[in-house]
Amino acid sequence: MARQRFEPGTILRIDVDGRSHAYARMLAHHPHVAVYDRITDAELSPEEVVALPVLFVVPVFGRAYHKGRWPKVGAVPIEQAPVEIPEYFMQDMFNPHDCQILDHSGNARPATPEECVGLERAAVWDAEHVEERLRDRDANRPNAHVERTKVRLV
């Protein structure tokens, strides 16, 4: 398979368990993808995919799509169904009072740990961890990666 490039608007199919799958979409700012809130065994059109609620938005390593682990199955231009890229947080592991909130361009501002509650830690996700997060969501259980990376309140 030819190397797949990051192209905003591209819809990706994520195999969840060998029987069912979810969908993600490449967003305007590399390497962010929106993962949609549906695990199914049905094939959805790109228009049906972008009509679904977004479950989460995370940056992912290129290994997820470069060699076809998450194959491209269509595209919907970003302008037709925009998805906002959320802010993320960073927290110093030795001084948990030292936090920053970052936008999708990497611009940072100081923040308190309390301001970071509800935000995801700034990290690039492996395909396997996104797939595990989807399985955990489907099984209605907490995801270890999400729990481990939550902001530490002091």
Give short role names for the model-derived ranges:
Residues 1-32:
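Short N-terminal edge-element motif at the start of the domain
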Residues 55-154:
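Beta-strand-rich cores of mature extracytoplasmic or soluble domains
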